[in-house]
Structures are given as structure tokens and as C-alpha cells.
């Protein structure tokens, strides 16, 4: 899968929040949206607002591609119950995201790299696929040889972040477990997200 290589700071400025949790908050230096007239926010159309909600969600989960987002939505449609909740659950239970939620990486992008480079185990077996769906009861851990990596220890010690209630964390053993399926109200998104708006947008565009 292609990795996003654009400016993450521009994205943070666009939404007015340190959306990726970067150590150097890009808003401290440039608080306005990118562009010559960044300080002036023009009123968006309904389509523009829907599009922005979708783009925010893609950003939160590590700059997912349009194809990936649509695939998750179509899977959610096939499940019984609330489509929006199923959709959010699948995004939240991606391995790279839960590695980030367990504080093994400072950012979602650092977590993606840990997975891709083979530092992560699921139930004791190496999994290097970022989109791997973690199920309740599965244990995520750092490979023993990788536990000396400085950035992992630094991320675990970051007091600014906490582990959400649907995960248990064993910092001493560099591991954590998904306790239950997360619901949208529990997901620690750094910015407000409207799932109904996103699902409505995807329903009319796929």
C-alpha cells in the first residue's frame, strides 16, 4: 500500500488541531489554515462539509486511501445492526491504530512503521500488515528484540496520552489486549467526527 508523503502539518492547520499528536505542535507556529487567505474561513457547502468530515476520518487513521475507506464502508453495510458503528469499529480495530492507542508509537505514522517493520506480535506471532483486524481477546505486543528501541519507551512514558477503556495495557511487558469491541463514543478522536454525515456521503458516492 502506498504511504502518504505529503505535509502532515498542512493537514493539522487545515483542521485547526494537532490531529496527529505530533510532539511539535504545528499550530504554535502557523495557526491559520494553509493558503494566502488562511485566516479567513469561507462558508462551505453541504457537499464541502461532508467531504471534510470524510477527509478528517481518513487522516485520523493514518491517511487511509479512498479505496480503503470505501471497502470498510461496504463491509459495514453487509453486517446487521448500526452501519456507522460497524464502520468505526473496523477502523479502530486496525492493528496499526491499536498499536498507536497502546502508546507504542508517538503518532499513528510511527505505529504504522512499527507494524510494517515487523516489530509487532499478535498472540505471539509476527504480523506486519497494518490493516490486520484485531479481535477481542487478542494480545498485541512488542517483539522482545525490539523492546530496546528508544522511541517505543519514550512513547509509553508520554503522560499526555492515556490508553482507552476497551484496551488493557501491560507496560512492563510491552503488551496490551483488546478487551471488547470499541464503540464510537469510546474512541479518542482528536477532533469531532460526524459518522452519520460520512456514511451518508459514502452511501451516495459508492
UniProtKB/Swiss-Prot annotation:
Please give one Pfam family short name: S4
Q: Give TM regions.
A: none
Domain spans labelled S4 RNA-binding = 93-156
GO biological process entries: ribosomal small subunit biogenesis; translation
Q: Which InterPro entries match?
A: Ribosomal_uS4, Ribosomal_uS4_bac-type, Ribosomal_uS4_CS, Ribosomal_uS4_N, S4_RNA-bd, S4_RNA-bd_sf
**Function (record text):** One of the primary rRNA binding proteins, it binds directly to 16S rRNA where it nucleates assembly of the body of the 30S subunit. With S5 and S12 plays an important role in translational accuracy.
* Record's protein name: Small ribosomal subunit protein uS4
Amino acid at each position: 500500500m502506498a504511504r502518504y508523503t505529503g505535509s502532515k502539518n498542512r493537514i493539522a492547520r487545515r483542521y485547526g488541531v494537532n490531529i496527529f499528536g505530533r510532539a511539535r505542535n504545528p499550530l504554535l507556529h502557523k495557526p491559520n489554515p494553509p493558503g494566502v487567505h488562511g485566516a479567513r474561513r469561507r462558508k462551505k457547502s453541504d457537499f464541502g462539509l461532508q467531504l471534510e468530515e470524510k477527509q478528517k476520518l481518513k487522516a485520523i487513521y493514518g491517511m487511509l486511501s479512498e479505496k480503503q475507506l470505501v471497502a470498510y464502508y461496504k463491509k459495514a453495510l453487509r453486517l446487521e445492526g448500526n452501519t456507522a458503528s460497524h464502520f468505526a469499529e473496523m477502523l479502530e480495530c486496525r492493528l496499526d491504530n491499536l498499536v498507536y492507542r497502546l502508546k507504542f508509537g508517538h503518532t499513528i505514522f510511527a505505529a504504522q512503521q512499527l507494524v510494517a517493520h515487523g516489530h509487532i506480535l499478535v498472540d505471539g506471532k509476527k504480523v506486519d500488515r497494518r490493516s490486520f483486524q484485531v479481535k477481542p481477546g487478542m494480545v498485541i505486543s512488542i517483539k522482545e528484540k525490539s523492546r530496546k528501541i528508544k522511541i517505543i519507551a519514550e512513547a509509553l512514558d508520554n503522560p499526555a496520552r492515556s490508553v482507552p477503556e476497551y484496551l488493557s495495557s501491560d507496560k512492563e511487558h510491552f503488551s496490551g489486549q483488546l478487551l471488547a469491541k470499541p464503540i464510537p463514543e469510546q474512541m479518542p478522536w482528536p477532533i469531532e467526527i460526524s459518522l452519520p454525515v460520512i456514511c451518508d456521503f459514502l452511501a451516495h458516492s459508492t
